[in-house]
Amino acid sequence: MCGIFGYCNFLIEKTRGEIIDTLIEGLQALEYKEYDSSGISIQGDELKSLNIYKQTGKISSLKEEIDLYNLNKNLPFISHCGIAHTRRATHGGLRRANCHPHNSDPSNEFVVVHNGVITNFANLKALLVAKGYVFKSDTDTECIPKLYKHIYDTSIELGYNLDFHVLTNLVLKELEGSYGLLCTSSHFPDEVVAARKGSPLVIGVKGKTDMDVNFVEVEYLDQEEDYLKLNTQTKSSGNVLAAAPVKYNTCLRKSPPLRSQYLRNSTTSTFNHGSSTETPAENGLPRPMEFYLSSDCASLARYVSKVVYLEDNDIAHIYDGELHIHCSKIGSEDFSFRTELSKIKKGPYDNFMQKEIYEQCETTKNVMRGRVDAFTNRVVLGGLENWLTELRRAKRIIMIASKASFHSCLAARPIFEELMEVPVNVELALDFVDRNCCIFRNDVCIFVSRSGETTDTINALNYCIKKEAVTIGVVNCSGSSISRFTHCGVHTNTGPEKGIATTKSYTSQYIALVMIALWMSEDLVSKIERRKEIIQALTIVPSQIKEVLELEPLIIELCDKKLKQHDTFLLLGRGYQFASALEGASKMKEISYVHSESILTNELGHRVLAVASDNPPIIAFATKDAFSPKIASCIDQIIERKGNPIIICNKGHKIWEQDKQKGNVVTLEVPQTVDCLQGILNVIPLQLISYWLAIKKDIGVDLPRDSAMSAPDI
């Protein structure tokens, strides 16, 4: 699984070259998700024909593959639907046959791109093989288009002419597991269906004017009412299986069509609404429209400003300039979002990772803007206010996350324990679900995710919701699954993070969690002075980050002369800084391709050095806090054993001055702040070391090998 993108134009003439370019640009916007192959499907030269182009490797290889066919890129299409995909091999190895899109047969009657895992694909494959279908790949996805064809052919034999979304529903009923998929078909030209269950999909709408967007058909149909009828009437008969009169359809409406006294009146919608027949387009003709579909809303930022998020079990059907959403439940919502294009371009930087490291001065301001008041020493979190009573009477706090988000939770755990005086657990999302942890109604569960779509974290969230715990989301993407399914939350306002390495999201999550701890403990009189100290320190963190970034020339020299020849690193930390060591070690593995291990300082003597060869570089966090004397003692032992540690310490810390002059140690001096925030400053030198080690080794830092933004649910 990896990235999905689709593009549909209706009554807007586009050349084949323009359509291909749009699909390729969409895939390039998803490149920050690690992938190893890509492909697209577009209409062929003949009516009702679909062509597939796919290739292993980077998107540039796909472009070269397409060029080999000498396509007529000037061929115009007044209406067209194309789909595209980047794949990271899960089911089936890395070979061209396993790349998406997948087809139903050599004629490409049905073509599918898919994210997720179909858990019953072996049974489906056996059934379809028995029916005479030939499989060319090792993937679970290939069973989907073949199942489409099998059900379609069977329905035709029985005399049924099913609509595309009805056919899709019959297919989905046979699938077990998770999916986000797009399907096109030669039997339904210029149409596309999208469906999701456990894997995100978002649809962007674009017209020639805002009015066109406000009045595009978005028809919400009740799945049970719709599909159980299995109405065989086609669109040509004028009936689109509507569960309500067409006059109630609205664009991007927050409430479904008015069908009963229990539903909100459509006039409460904050968007313009009305019947498309009551607000005809110019000259009474259908409105020209464009639709963009993606697994990640950030990839739509350059095209649209309004998007619709599909919920689990929803089916979206796009045709004739209309978007019909067949809902599993009432109340599918729409969102407006704004993402400045400058935030998804590299600008003057060589790559996105470098850009995002330097953006931390600004992103740490953004997460605090309007929330931290240094004059009143208060933290205001409007996203949590409605749950104030439940949150402050929590008997236990559980933070659940994966990867770098897990490290940010570990970094914030001590301050939660200190300020809240309740037990605080930090859990890896996958392990949390596997153990069926005990969760109670008076627990507060905090879910932290960079994308808001991390599969394991979403599974943990669903588990906690069933246990009736209060849930908080800390995410960067508004409208993501975690932000919508949690009771309340804090948006980190970090902006798009295109690099695989989590840099600015880590520091923003760290600050967001500290702010939650400050907000939840506001009623504890005994913590007033401690809270004031932290709030005052928060306000100067952005300027202190700027000071830390001034270490870059020293770090470049250090990587060039002392570090790049090593392939093993040890990182030492204790207290708040153990999380910094974990995050730093993770970055070095992920970006620099070196073995790095994070160790509690007092564990160093327990045979760790015995298994490390060639006197590996040791990076120690020794900034001032309650553990400083013990860490200094540990560093002294390393020096005595002929080690040459790299020490991250505070400015003006003179304890290693003599050793520094002798060349025994290298110090990276960072500004001093309160202990619970020091990790924000300390992790940045490790980000820079990871970055420059990779650059010195000619590694592509934005797309390191074998990394993925979200893992499949296996």
From Swiss-Prot:
<dbReference type="GO" id="GO:0097367">
    <property type="term" value="F:carbohydrate derivative binding"/>
</dbReference>
<keyword id="KW-0032">Aminotransferase</keyword>
<dbReference type="Pfam" id="PF01380">
    <property type="entry name" value="SIS"/>
</dbReference>
<dbReference type="InterPro" id="IPR035490">
    <property type="entry name" value="GlmS/FrlB_SIS"/>
</dbReference>
<dbReference type="GO" id="GO:0006048">
    <property type="term" value="P:UDP-N-acetylglucosamine biosynthetic process"/>
</dbReference>
<dbReference type="GO" id="GO:0004360">
    <property type="term" value="F:glutamine-fructose-6-phosphate transaminase (isomerizing) activity"/>
</dbReference>
<keyword id="KW-0808">Transferase</keyword>
<comment type="function">
    <text>Involved in amino sugar synthesis (formation of chitin, supplies the amino sugars of asparagine-linked oligosaccharides of glycoproteins).</text>
</comment>
<dbReference type="InterPro" id="IPR047084">
    <property type="entry name" value="GFAT_N"/>
</dbReference>
<feature type="domain" description="Glutamine amidotransferase type-2">
    <location>
        <begin position="2"/>
        <end position="321"/>
    </location>
</feature>
<dbReference type="InterPro" id="IPR035466">
    <property type="entry name" value="GlmS/AgaS_SIS"/>
</dbReference>
<dbReference type="Pfam" id="PF13522">
    <property type="entry name" value="GATase_6"/>
</dbReference>
<dbReference type="InterPro" id="IPR029055">
    <property type="entry name" value="Ntn_hydrolases_N"/>
</dbReference>
<protein>
    <recommendedName>
        <fullName>Putative glutamine--fructose-6-phosphate aminotransferase [isomerizing]</fullName>
        <ecNumber>2.6.1.16</ecNumber>
    </recommendedName>
</protein>
<dbReference type="InterPro" id="IPR001347">
    <property type="entry name" value="SIS_dom"/>
</dbReference>
<dbReference type="InterPro" id="IPR017932">
    <property type="entry name" value="GATase_2_dom"/>
</dbReference>
<keyword id="KW-0315">Glutamine amidotransferase</keyword>
<feature type="domain" description="SIS 2">
    <location>
        <begin position="559"/>
        <end position="704"/>
    </location>
</feature>
<feature type="domain" description="SIS 1">
    <location>
        <begin position="387"/>
        <end position="526"/>
    </location>
</feature>
<dbReference type="GO" id="GO:0006487">
    <property type="term" value="P:protein N-linked glycosylation"/>
</dbReference>
<comment type="pathway">
    <text>Nucleotide-sugar biosynthesis; UDP-N-acetyl-alpha-D-glucosamine biosynthesis; alpha-D-glucosamine 6-phosphate from D-fructose 6-phosphate: step 1/1.</text>
</comment>
<feature type="active site" description="Nucleophile; for GATase activity">
    <location>
        <position position="2"/>
    </location>
</feature>
<feature type="region of interest" description="Disordered">
    <location>
        <begin position="266"/>
        <end position="285"/>
    </location>
</feature>
<dbReference type="InterPro" id="IPR046348">
    <property type="entry name" value="SIS_dom_sf"/>
</dbReference>
<dbReference type="GO" id="GO:0006002">
    <property type="term" value="P:fructose 6-phosphate metabolic process"/>
</dbReference>
<keyword id="KW-0677">Repeat</keyword>
<feature type="compositionally biased region" description="Polar residues">
    <location>
        <begin position="266"/>
        <end position="280"/>
    </location>
</feature>
